[in-house]
């Protein structure tokens, strides 16, 4: 409760001291102070002494009364000791004052008065100042006190006493003259004490002098090397500040106030500096003492009228900028640049850099002007300064926060652990962390097709989903063929809307073992067929439309083309006899009723919009992962399911019979299948084995054009495989580069159908009974008859027929069958073959060559210049084209997208080695089992479990042989960096990177020294990069470090520089292929001489394989280093760069899978390329004279050839002379040709040369040959 306070009117005279220096605003101070002080609280009335008039007359004293009164409000709740009282002060306009009620002797101490320092005050003219109702004032007391020192340093103290804690001390007023002073003040820490300096009588007011206040101890000296001193004239005692000197003179020097500081704390006593020995330089203005004249002259600047350098945080001003900077350091301690090599601190990074250069030789002298961090090189500083730039290209897709460095973004992403899966796919419900990963997933999503039928499709063509898309309907007879992509790679998103092929039914489709090798958005593709009314016809329309024959022949009925577009599409391909009647009747009717549907589908036959990113999908691409526009193989099963979806188009069978007759079109199931279809279901798929051989072999065809195929069709017969790879989706290959023959490009129309039963064979009639002939081909060209396989003939239809996987079977199937095989394989012998299903001969008179198709074929994006000069030789010189075909480097080694095949087939290869352990579940094979880096024909449960136990990345689907590899790879997605440097704040995802960082950065180890300039480097890659500069300076190749000379006199880079050679592969690619072409052209003209050279070269190759400088001898070291480099690039490089895309023979996958093969004992069945070279070394008499082997390895791995390929690139990078290049390229070409031959001959026994060279090649390519033996090619 507040109560009224009594007020008196003070006397006012005409002599108001308006100009009094102690009262600049008398009315404001007087009235407000009284009011506010009276508002604090209430107490009982205090007797007020006689009013004190203004000291304007000698008649009046502060103790005398005054006839005038002014209103003074006395607070009633001030806790004041009994020895004192509050009443009207004798100082005019000061308000209340403290008056003594008892006698006080000198030396008594009052206090403390707790205050809080402040940095600003209203007035700077007064030593003491009371300001009421100020915003900076303590809210409960309302008083701010400013204490100033005449040298310009001020300290402001706000009364911080709580209510009832001695706040009465603030009412001690300032005396008008020094004679009236009876108190002095001293500050200890944040407390103020009052000391009585002379006796105070009762009724006398307590006063201090205006110039005597609580002064801080000293000021900042102008220079750090000088100590300011002040000398007493009487006793020659030195003091640190003028305040100390004045106190000394007033209270201690002489008899005046000698006992002033007795009883006070030792801190209050001035510390004398002792008598100075020598002449002292004193400032006449401020009496400061300096040790030398120069210091005094520097000091005299401060006494000028105007100070140019003013502090923006306090009222201080300086004449020297250095003093201002030094002073500002006291305000902001964070702007200090400390030397890392000594204790000095600098305010400017340039001074720090200058200091390091002059005092610390070799230290990091490049300092950042923003943060002061130092770097050893200017490039390091430049890279660091990106942190302070405003450009932040790396944006978090979750919270959209941007960063200047990719590593910072990766580190930031770890903060989103709780929201990394907040973006949901609206179709399948799968969660994703970023929009880019969601967009990537939607291309493969299982929910529905996200791509409208445009571009390669006819406009407006509806895409009807297949009933097989339902994941809840797995086939009861699920086995390997139906275990598609997701069975082998359970976590890899299956390319849902990725088209396998955009060709009409004449084009084979990519089989389900390797879906989505080429994403649809990777390369632009023009429409393969122009939109026509035929393509725009509605689905399920019953028009007997005809597909325009691209071969220039009479148009075929669409039903004819479509019925054979997918082997197993119709029930006519049923495996059992009870379905044969439907093969003849109902199935053909279904096809007729869906003729327009098939015609539409023919334009996107292999658009496998397998929508499956569902990691739980178990049926894979073989069944439920068929595309929305693909066929549903179930709809054509022999059980008569309704045809609701669109058929799976692939290499079908051209029907024998009238081209316009739909009813006479019997559709046969091709024998070219690695897995016979089960009884319940016929799926239009083939195993991954067929896919890999067809894909790889067809890619090989791609690089040599149709020239060899024309010769093959005329003279050699068909290859042992059919071109089933969708080169319409290869990157823009021109028409002249298409590897398919005209017949191969029109599989569904041009390939002969095989009768499935005697009754089907009789339906063909005439010569077609022995050899069903294709009406779409011209009968003037005759193809040779392929030899019958050596295996046993097929048993009767009632018996169980083992799989026929021999090369001869593949060759026959490529002629007779379509490009599609059953998606379901046969595990336990339930597949029953008809008597006519054995091994029918192929009619030689029915296989003419067809004119080329005239579809729009894009051109390759990086191979165009290679084939500009080679195409002319292919048709005129078949043998030369054949050599050119196989002597070229394997496309898998260079095509960036082929690394996907390498990755997928590598994982499938391990299944081959397990076939010996699962013999109880596998039937004996009468022929040599075909196993080209693919799973065996049947997979038992342990095999399937082993396939699922692969360590698969859940983000990108990559598969790793060990969990450690997967763990390290996952850090590239999550950004996790668990290895932190103990010396700095950097962290790493790989421990080896941390060790290298500590070794190079902190330990300053530089073990790699350039022998040309003696410069040292911390990493081998830096040394290699440095050596390239010497190469440009025309340094001899033999002097380059990392380059070893082999037996041929050529050079190859050491493994440590292999990564740099990979980086230059793209630049050297054109020259590389150009040299190969030139070499092949020369070898064609000098066959006799090259035969001798190649014998010698092969021996040298065998010797060079043992050279310690080759990468094959140090693969483990290279693997570890490459892994580290790749991981580091994933973390710190710019986003979007991929190591695997720039270098086709990616070192990391190769090394990873080699480790996997080392772990699996069963993989020892695979005969590597090194073993091939050892075999050749045993027989030095011939180029490829190998000892007879009963069976060749089941896991032939072209990776071994890829490992050798880097030697050629290293040779190119070393810029060797042309002669040495020819030798090396010859060796590499022969190695790869040998690898290709082995890939096609696999289990064929190898003998010494005993037959003509052409016959050997014919045998390799599956053409007519008298012997099953494989012969070396010494004549090439």
From Swiss-Prot:
UniProt cross-references to PROSITE patterns, sorted A to Z: SET (PS50280), ZINC_FINGER_C2H2_1 (PS00028), ZINC_FINGER_C2H2_2 (PS50157)
Enzyme Commission code(s) on record: 2.1.1.367
Primary localization class, coarse: nucleus
Region (Disordered) location: 1-68, 533-657, 772-804, 1033-1065, 1105-1163
Source superkingdom: Eukaryota
Keywords for the protein's UniProt record, in alphabetical order: Activator, Cardiomyopathy, Chromosomal rearrangement, Cytoplasm, Differentiation, Disease variant, DNA-binding, Metal-binding, Methyltransferase, Nucleus, Repeat, Repressor, Transcription, Transcription regulation, Transferase, Zinc, Zinc-finger
InterPro entries assigned: PRDM16_PR-SET (IPR044410), SET_dom (IPR001214), SET_dom_sf (IPR046341), Zinc_finger (IPR050331), Znf_C2H2_sf (IPR036236), Znf_C2H2_type (IPR013087)
Catalytic activity, as annotated: L-lysyl(9)-[histone H3] + S-adenosyl-L-methionine = N(6)-methyl-L-lysyl(9)-[histone H3] + S-adenosyl-L-homocysteine + H(+)
Cell location: Nucleus; Cytoplasm
Function: Binds DNA and functions as a transcriptional regulator. Displays histone methyltransferase activity and monomethylates 'Lys-9' of histone H3 (H3K9me1) in vitro. Probably catalyzes the monomethylation of free histone H3 in the cytoplasm which is then transported to the nucleus and incorporated into nucleosomes where SUV39H methyltransferases use it as a substrate to catalyze histone H3 'Lys-9' trimethylation. Likely to be one of the primary histone methyltransferases along with MECOM/PRDM3 that direct cytoplasmic H3K9me1 methylation.
Family: Belongs to the PRDM16 family.
Name this polypeptide is given: Histone-lysine N-methyltransferase PRDM16
Organism from which the protein derives: Homo sapiens
Designated gene of the protein: PRDM16
């Amino acid at each position: 409760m507040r109560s009224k306070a009594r007020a008196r009117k003070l006397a006012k005279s005409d002599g108001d001291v308006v100009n009094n220096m102690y009262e600049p605003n008398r009315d404001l101070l007087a009235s407000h102070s009284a009011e506010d002080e009276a508002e604090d609280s209430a107490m009982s009335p205090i007797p007020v002494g006689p009013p004190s008039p203004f000291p304007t007359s000698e008649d009046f004293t502060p103790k005398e009364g005054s006839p005038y009164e002014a209103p003074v409000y006395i607070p009633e709740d001030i806790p004041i000791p009994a020895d004192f009282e509050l009443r009207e002060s004798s100082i005019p306009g000061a308000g209340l004052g403290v008056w003594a009620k008892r006698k006080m002797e000198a030396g008594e101490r009052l206090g403390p008065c707790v205050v809080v320092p402040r940095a600003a005050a209203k007035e700077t003219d007064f030593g003491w100042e009371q300001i009421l109702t100020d915003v900076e004032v303590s809210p409960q007391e309302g008083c701010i006190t400013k204490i100033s020192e005449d040298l310009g340093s001020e300290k402001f103290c706000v009364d911080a006493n709580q209510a009832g804690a001695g706040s009465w001390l603030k009412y001690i007023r300032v005396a008008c003259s020094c004679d009236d002073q009876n108190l002095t003040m001293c500050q200890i820490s944040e407390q103020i004490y009052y000391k009585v300096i002379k006796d105070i009588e009762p009724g006398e007011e307590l006063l201090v002098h205006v110039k005597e206040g609580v002064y801080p101890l000293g000021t900042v000296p102008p220079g750090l090397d000088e100590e300011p001193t002040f000398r007493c004239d009487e006793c020659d005692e030195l003091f640190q500040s003028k305040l100390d000197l004045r106190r000394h003179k007033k209270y201690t020097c002489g008899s005046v106030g000698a006992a002033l500081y007795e009883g006070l704390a030792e801190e209050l006593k001035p510390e004398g500096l002792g008598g100075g020995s020598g002449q002292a330089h004193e400032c006449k203005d401020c009496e400061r003492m300096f040790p030398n004249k120069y210091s005094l002259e520097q000091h005299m600047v401060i006494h000028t009228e105007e100070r140019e350098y003013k502090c923006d945080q306090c009222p201080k001003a300086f004449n020297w900028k250095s003093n201002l900077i030094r002073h500002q350091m006291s305000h902001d301690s964070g702007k200090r640049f400390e030397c890392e090599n000594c204790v000095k601190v600098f305010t400017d990074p340039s001074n720090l850099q200058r200091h390091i250069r002059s005092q610390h030789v070799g230290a990091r002298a490049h300092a950042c002007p923003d943060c002061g961090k130092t770097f050893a090189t200017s490039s390091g500083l430049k890279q660091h300064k990106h942190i302070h730039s405003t450009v932040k290209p790396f944006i978090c897709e979750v919270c959209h926060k941007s960063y200047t460095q990719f590593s910072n973004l990766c580190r930031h992403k770890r903060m989103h652990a709780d929201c990394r899966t907040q973006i949901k796919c609206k179709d399948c419900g799968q969660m994703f962390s970023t929009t880019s990963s969601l967009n990537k997933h939607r291309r493969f999503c299982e929910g529905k097709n996200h791509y409208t039928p445009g571009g390669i499709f006819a406009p407006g063509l509806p895409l009807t989903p297949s009933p097989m898309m339902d994941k809840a309907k797995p086939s009861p007879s699920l086995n390997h063929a139906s275990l598609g992509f997701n069975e082998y790679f359970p976590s890899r998103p299956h390319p849902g809307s990725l088209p396998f092929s955009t060709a009409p039914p004449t084009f084979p489709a990519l089989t389900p073992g390797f879906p989505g090798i080429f994403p649809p958005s990777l390369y632009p593709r023009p429409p393969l067929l122009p939109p026509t009314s035929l393509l725009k016809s509605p689905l399920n329309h019953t028009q007997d439309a005809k597909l325009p024959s691209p071969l220039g022949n009479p148009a075929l009925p669409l039903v004819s083309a479509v019925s054979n577009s997918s082997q197993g599409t119709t029930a006519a391909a049923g495996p059992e006899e009870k379905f044969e009647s439907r093969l003849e009747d109902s199935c053909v009717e279904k096809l007729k009723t869906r003729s327009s549907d098939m015609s539409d589908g023919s334009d996107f036959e292999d658009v496998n919009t397998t929508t499956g990113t569902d990691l739980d999908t178990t049926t894979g691409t073989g069944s439920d992962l068929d595309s929305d526009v693909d066929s549903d193989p179930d709809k054509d099963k022999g059980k008569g399911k309704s045809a609701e979806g669109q058929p799976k188009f692939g290499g079908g069978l051209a029907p024998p019979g009238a081209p316009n007759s739909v009813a006479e079109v019997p559709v046969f199931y091709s024998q070219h299948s690695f897995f016979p279809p089960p009884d319940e279901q016929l799926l239009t798929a083939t195993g991954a084995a067929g896919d890999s051989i067809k894909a790889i072999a067809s890619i090989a065809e791609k690089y040599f054009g149709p020239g060899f195929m024309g010769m093959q069709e005329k003279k050699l017969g068909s290859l042992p495989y059919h071109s089933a790879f969708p080169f319409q989706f290869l990157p823009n290959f021109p028409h002249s580069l298409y590897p398919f023959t005209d017949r191969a490009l029109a599989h569904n129309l041009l390939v002969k159908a095989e009768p499935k039963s005697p009754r089907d064979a009789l339906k063909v009639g005439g010569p077609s009974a022995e050899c069903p002939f294709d009406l779409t081909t011209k009968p003037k060209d005759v193809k040779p008859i392929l030899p019958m396989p050596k295996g046993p003939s097929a048993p009767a239809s009632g018996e169980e027929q083992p799989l026929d996987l021999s090369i001869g079977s593949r060759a026959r199937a490529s002629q007779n069958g379509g490009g599609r095989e059953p998606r379901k394989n046969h595990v336990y012998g339930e597949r029953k073959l008809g008597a006519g299903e054995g091994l029918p001969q192929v009619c030689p008179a029915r296989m003419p060559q067809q004119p080329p198709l005239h579809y729009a074929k894009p051109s390759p994006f990086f191979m165009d210049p290679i084939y500009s000069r080679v195409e002319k030789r292919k048709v005129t010189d078949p043998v030369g084209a054949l050599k050119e075909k196989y002597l070229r480097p394997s496309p898998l080694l260079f095509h960036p997208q082929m690394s996907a095949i390498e990755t997928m087939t590598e994982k499938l290869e391990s299944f081959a080695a397990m076939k010996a352990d699962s013999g109880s579940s596998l039937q004996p094979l009468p022929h040599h089992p075909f196993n080209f880096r693919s799973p065996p024909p049947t997979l038992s449960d342990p095999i399937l479990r082993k396939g699922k136990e692969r360590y698969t990345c859940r983000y990108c689907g990559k598969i790793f042989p060990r969990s450690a590899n997967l763990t390290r790879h996952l850090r590239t997605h999550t950004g996790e960096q668990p290895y932190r440097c103990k010396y700095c704040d950097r962290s790493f995802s790989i421990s080896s990177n941390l060790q290298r960082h500590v070794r190079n950065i902190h330990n300053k180890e530089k073990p790699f020294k350039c022998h040309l300039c003696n410069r040292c480097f911390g990493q081998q890659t830096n040394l290699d990069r440095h050596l390239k500069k010497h190469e440009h300076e025309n340094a001899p190749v033999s002097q380059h470090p990392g380059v070893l000379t082999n037996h041929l006199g050529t050079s190859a880079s050491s493994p440590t520089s292999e990564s740099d050679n990979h980086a230059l592969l793209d630049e050297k690619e054109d020259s590389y292929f150009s040299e190969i072409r030139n070499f092949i052209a020369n070898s064609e003209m000098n066959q006799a001489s090259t035969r001798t050279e190649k014998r010698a070269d092969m021996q040298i190759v065998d010797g060079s394989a043992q050279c310690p400088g080759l990468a094959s001898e140090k693969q483990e070291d290279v693997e570890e280093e490459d892994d580290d480099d790749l991981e580091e690039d994933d973390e710190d490089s710019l986003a979007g760069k991929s190591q695997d895309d720039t270098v086709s023979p990616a070192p990391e996958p190769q090394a990873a899978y080699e480790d996997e093969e080392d772990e699996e004992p069963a993989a020892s069945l695979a005969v590597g390329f090194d073993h091939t070279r050892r075999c050749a070394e045993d027989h030095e008499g011939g180029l490829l004279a190998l000892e007879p082997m009963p069976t060749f390895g089941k896991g032939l791995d072209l990776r071994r050839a890829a490992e050798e390929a880097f030697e050629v690139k290293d040779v190119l990078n070393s810029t060797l002379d042309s002669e040495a290049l020819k030798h090396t390229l010859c060796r590499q070409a022969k190695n790869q040709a040998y690898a290709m031959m082995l890939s096609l001959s696999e289990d064929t026994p190898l003998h010494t040369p005993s037959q003509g060279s052409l016959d050997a090649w014919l045998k390799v390519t599956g053409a007519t040959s008298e012997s099953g033996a494989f012969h070396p090619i010494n004549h090439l």
